[in-house]
Regions:
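Short clusters of hydrophobic/aromatic residues that line enzyme substrate/ligand-binding pockets
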Residues: 254
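Primarily interfacial, aromatic-capped hydrophobic alpha-helices that serve as membrane anchors
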Residues: 273-274
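A short acidic, helix-capping loop that chelates divalent metal ions and anchors anionic groups
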Residues: 84, 250-251
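An N-terminally biased module of ancient metal coordination in phosphate/nucleic-acid-related enzymes
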Residues: 1-70, 154-155, 167-250, 259, ...
Length: 274
């Protein structure tokens, strides 16, 4: 069975519609696909309606504040009809909107006008993310690549960055649990944290009642995966895997390059056992 438990659609900052994403995943022989758009579950129904043979797991990726870092917690196997979940996600989207407006003001002060308006147009009805800003800035030739825009304008310490006020990790875990889901710490090695801070993060996540951490992601060294697997084991956390697919590209594909080390307890066994 091929599992991919982390990906994005046009319901947040992905390039493919939920239907296109599901069709692509089916072509890639994915059996179980979790749709995990940023702070929304809006793409789930269309994805489920489009699936012919794969199973769609309802999910979301919640932005959290932790010591001034943006940390992402993925919720899997959610009851998306749960009101408390939808209320919390709606609050997050309001924060996104206010942050985006402030990002626009800060960029304008630095002489870069009208970025918020363009980013908003790109996002349409989806929650507005820094990816939308990044696309606008690249389009205007202000940086040579999507990644460089973050280094130059959008990541912490740069002119377009606005300190976050997302919910905290405990609140995200609680929200996910109330909606009968499982809480997964997303991509622990992608936050620009030292190993010491990653250990602290995983340990706190476990203490707060988190269920799993992502251990297998594309382009990760075996050593890194082994290290995350041992951290999970140490804190009695399950393991998850996902591509974090946003757009078709040469180095990231749905369901590819994902395999958990043997000692891991796959998170999907938890809902399969229900
Ligand atoms: P936001 O949740 O609005 O802060 O936007 C975060 C999204 O921007 C992430 O989910 C990624 O898709 C993208 N992103 C964040 N940081 C980077 C980075 N350094 N390089 C490329 N993409 C990034
Ligand atoms: Mn994203
Ligand atoms: Mn993320
Ligand atoms: Mn993601």
């Amino acid at each position: 069975m091929r599992f991919d438990l982390h990906c994005h659609t046009t319901a947040s900052d992905g390039g493919l519609s939920p239907k296109e994403l599901v069709m692509r995943a089916e072509n890639m022989q994915v059996d179980v696909l979790a749709i995990t758009d940023h702070d929304t579950t809006a793409g789930i129904e269309q994805a489920q309606a489009s699936a012919k043979h794969l199973q769609v797991i309802p999910g979301t990726e919640i932005s959290c504040a932790w010591h001034a870092f943006d940390i992402h917690v993925v919720g899997l196997n959610l009851d998306i009809a749960h009101q408390g979940l939808q209320q919390q996600l709606s609050l997050q989207r309001e924060k996104r909107e206010l942050r985006a407006q402030e990002m626009g003001r800060r960029l304008a002060k630095a002489g870069i006008d009208g970025v918020y308006q363009q980013a908003k147009q790109l996002a349409g009805s989806a929650p507005i993310t820094r990816s939308h800003f990044a696309n606008v800035l690249v389009e205007r030739g202000l940086a040579t690549s999507f990644n460089k825009v973050f280094d130059k304008y959008l990541s912490r310490g740069n002119i377009g960055y606005v300190p976050n006020n997302w919910m905290n990790i405990g609140e995200a875990i609680e929200t996910i649990h109330q909606a009968k889901g499982f809480a997964v710490l997303a991509h622990p090695t992608h936050y620009d944290l030292s190993n010491k801070w990653i250990r602290k993060l995983v340990s706190e996540f476990a203490e707060l009642g988190g269920d799993a951490i992502e251990v297998a992601m594309p382009q990760m060294s075996k050593d890194q995966q082994q290290w995350l697997a041992s951290l999970a084991q140490q804190h009695q956390l399950c393991a998850s895997q996902g591509s974090d697919f946003h757009h078709p590209s040469t180095w990231r594909e749905l369901g590819r390059g994902l395999q958990l080390p043997d000692q891991c307890q796959p998170i999907w066994q938890r809902w399969q056992a229900l």
